[in-house]
Amino acid sequence: MSFVHLHVHTQYSILDGQSAISDLFARAKELEMPALAITDHGNMYGVKEFLKVAKKFPEVKPIIGCEIYVTRHYDHRLKDKDHRGYYHLILLAKNHNGYKNLMKIVSTGHIEGKYYDRPRVKHEIVEQYSKDLICCSACIAGEIPKAIIAGDMEAAEKAVMWHKRVFGEDYYLEVQQHKTLIPGQSQEVYEHQLVANEGIYELAVKTGTKVVATNDVHFVRKEDGPAHDRLICLTTNAYLTDTDRMRYTQQEYLKSEEEMLDMFYKHPETLSNTLEVAEKIEVFKVDKDPILPKFDLPEEFLADIDTYLERYKDIIDEGRCDKSGNERGEEFCRSVAYLCHLTYQGAQWRYGEQMTEEQAERIEFELKTICKMGFPDYFLIVQDFIAAARSEGISVGPGRGSAAGSAVAYCLKITNIDPIKYDLLFERFLNPDRINMPDVDIDFDDDGRYRVFQYIEEKYGKEQISHVITYGTMAAKSAIKDVARVSRMSIEESNRLTKLIPDKPIVQMEDAEDPFNEGDTLEEGQKLIEKEVEIDDPDNPGGKIKVKKQFKKYKKEVSYKPKLKNCYKLIPELKEELANGSDEVKDVLNYAQKLEGCVRQTGVHACAMIIGRSNLTEYIPICVANDKLTGEEVWVSQYDGHYIEEVGMLKMDFLGLRTLSIIKE
């Protein structure tokens, strides 16, 4: 037998889960588990990182899921105290279509049903997007366990039958068992779980539903429990010494198969059923080639489209098919023709009626490259909103970064720097050998930047536009301060410890060695040493021999980030505190290191915006945030800027440049 954890919270269950994704996979591999799920609370923030880390652990199949919140009433859009209640429910994607449906459910919760920070959906939304999803009944906050604990077996059975009707053989009842071993701590959770489990086993027999054992994982190893307890104190603004605060049982870690079997020895099938679930899951990719928005061409241009298609046939033919040989279609060809039309119009304005041979060849080369790589609409979109900005009197920067190397961008007035005159390379901006999305950073005056946002939203529609999420993590100093606060350490002592943490990298002089080759000379401070090294035996293929070689030994500067691990090793005062400080100081420093790097909050990127081809919830999970200027809710991607382009989305950076505002004023 083996076992798979299907109910797992990472640190993206913000200030509730402590597990680093890489640590989860490493532990799952160590325990020889064939798969591992991610089921964070109401979000998919960590999915891309989860899949990225999974590539390093091919033995462990990644399972994408979410613990969603389902309203107890008929409409998740009702937001008042009488409609605040919700249930927990686990959903797991069987394949890519299931992943898309999961994104729809999670996004709907954030866009329509968010209340008191809980993104809720009604049962009808779950049913609407249920295809290719596996469903588990969740913890004692789930609908079925709650009904059982309340003594309403009729309601529990009714809920089971609803879920079986919706999910069929992909619905599983879920049991958990967390008996705390902490002296003096209440066993209320465990007692409720025992009641719920008894009812679940009864309903499983009565309704023919399989049961899976889970452990509601919130941290990786048993010894991480006290650190997680401090994290919960941060979440609830409590002190460790508070008697009536929220507590976990400290049993919510990634337990081994043996530990799970010890709890569910009377029902070993609950472990083997997790393997059945894992076997239903396909390994699939969520990354895509670029999915650019469709740029609507003007009617007057389309009226004579055949002429333009013929005129620019050579350039169009360069990219008529994608890298797999698939036809890109008529819309693509029309976009290329319009891009060529605008570029050559702009070239006349920039260079005059008669271009030099160098100018003509450069523009044709760039257009063919843009067409071959499939990016004509990108340039059309950028030139459109820059032209709109200028027409509204918004100051636009001359161009920065590698985009200044594009003659096409110069002709389209995206930039105001002639790359031919200044001998700038186009290949730094766009290179056929590296299929990356173009990246044009555009400067606007501060007020104008927001007006450009508005223009794009009006042109493409609110459902195709999104801001980009950011994640704030606990840095070294804040981790010490946070742990010190919940430990009731004095402010003076907390400040004393944090002042020992440098703001800049720690620079050390360390020994280094390099081979000393014939013709080399020793510089000041270097000395020559001789060492025995192992090399390939030229007379014995596959064999090794030892020879003596010369090396130059010297001191070099090595820079370390001021993370707590490095600080404790390299800063004498902190080494002394860890060795001989008070128990309180040692606890604070040790637990701060365990919490350092945990995700603490989300934010919205100040400059980045996503423009999609259609409703963005078809491609990425969405959450919402309040616009700082208007107070209105805006869409925000649940994947951050590192991953947005990997899933095919067009991300643009609109930079507010104070200098432009000053010049304008």
Regions found by a protein language model. Name each.
Residues 1-665:
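Alpha-helical scaffold/interaction cores of sigma-54-like transcription cofactors
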